[in-house]
Amino acid sequence: MGNTNHKESFVSKYVFSQDHKMISKQFLITAIFMGIAGVMMSVFFRLQLGWPGESFAILETFMGKWAPNGVLDRNAYLALTTIHGTIMVFFVLTAGLSGTFSNLLIPLQIGARDMASGFLNMLSYWFFAVSSVMMLFSLLVEGGAASAGWTIYPPLSVLPQAMPGSGMGMTLWLLSMTLFVVSSLLGSLNYIVTIINLRTKGMSMTRLPLTIWAFFITAILGVLSFPVLVSAIVLLMMDRMMGTAFYLSDIFIGGEALDATGGSPILFQHLFWFLGHPEVYIVLLPALGISSEVIATNSRKPIFGYKAMVGSLMAIGFLSFIVWAHHMFITGMNPFLGSVFVFTTLLIAIPSAVKAFNYITTLWRGNLRFTPAMLFSIGLVSTFVTGGLTGIILADSALDVTLHDTYFVVGHFHIVMGLSAIFGMFAGVYHWFSKMFGTMLNTKLGFAHFWLTITCGYGVFFPMHFVGLAGAPRRYYNSSSFDFLSETADLQPIISVFAIIGSLSQLIFLFNFFYSIFRGQKAVQNPWKSNTLEWTTPVEHIHGNWPGALPEVHRWAYDYSNPVHEEDFVLQTTPLKDGEVGH
């Protein structure tokens, strides 16, 4: 039974909580602060890229010795790009999406009192929190933060003497990511067990909302892929500290040969990208699941092709494990092997196209309600399609030889993964904010936030494709130093202006978010007139979610505009009428 009189201390309620709803808020707020740090870093290095060598007081204020006289240091530039990428991919888009919305929605949408293990759920958050602090702390150590790129390729990540940032900063990066993986595994195992074992009466797998299917498949991807990253990190740490040579062979530093032979840095790339490409969908699938729910709810129509949507999630999840080497076409692999990975990569376009088609068909002739969540979900469909089209180009090994490690790649993955995932995250926050905090976000501020974000998002990353087609490599500190980049030099300030405006526009969201928590309009139980079980719980959080017996499910989650019923929505707990055919 749910309990409205459950007494807790401040520590047990807000710090070491085992309640899935509080843990979801802990993940979200931590991810927001990590996102602030990651976005600030991007602004700092975009100032350098847009106006090379110019002095900016803000750089000296925040960066200190790493920006003497307001000019960003070369090594600090590499550190910022490395930590920015790491924070945004793992700490914001992975933990911010899965940690927040899996925790919030899985028990509520399947009709469970809580997660299978509240204790493991608590541990999952605190491993993530400690990992976050450690990653940020690495910016403060002598020698600087890790600077080898977010992919930390050897030998720069193996040899402490290789470059500034390869010492203690890199060690902290490796330890932080190990803790992050532990957090991810604890959470993923909990999500899988909860979905399989704790569904309420009548909640068959074919009645699950698409959000739950997305979280379920994402958790499976995490359990299968993240341990491989830990294995790669363990071998790398052994190379760094124990004299092994898993990733080193015939290395010269300062003209002197190191006593390390027999290893291969390509081995690390295989291990990293075996996680790295499933990671793309660990980030994307929750966003797609959230958008499925938001689009159906605000179209007032059943989701088009429910079974095809589930099948496409499964197909994307499976294919994500057999495409990793498309990141490695230029490593000298056998051309036949390269063609195999070209084929498997192009196959992902099929289930991806199914999802895009079904989203558009759901919207077609629907009674559309343009809430901020709906706009961000439609924005996700836009970025998913446009970013996916450039992915088809990069999937061709012959084209990738030219475009590899250029701004074309940066533009591609920021649109298809970065913008799509962050749009899904924003859609989820706007849609379920009332369920998390009991108040409503300001809609007008939400509209302003969306239009500024999508305009600046495309303004930043669309021009990067042209810069990349001109041959501009990514991670260059000063592209104006090279004559062959002069044709696209004028685009860099434009990109930086959009990046700065887009970053500042997030202040609208931050104000709306924190103001609404304390001063927002009180929410009603089901503000969006949605069908799923979370909207049958009280606005005020209680332990066990429902005050009485657990709800019983009689129908699927997308019974919108059913002519048998007067309302244009039907809760899953509503019994079937005589003669009504259920799902």
Whereabouts are the PLM-identified features?
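Membrane-embedded and interfacial regions of multi-pass energy-transducing membrane proteins
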Residues: 1-583
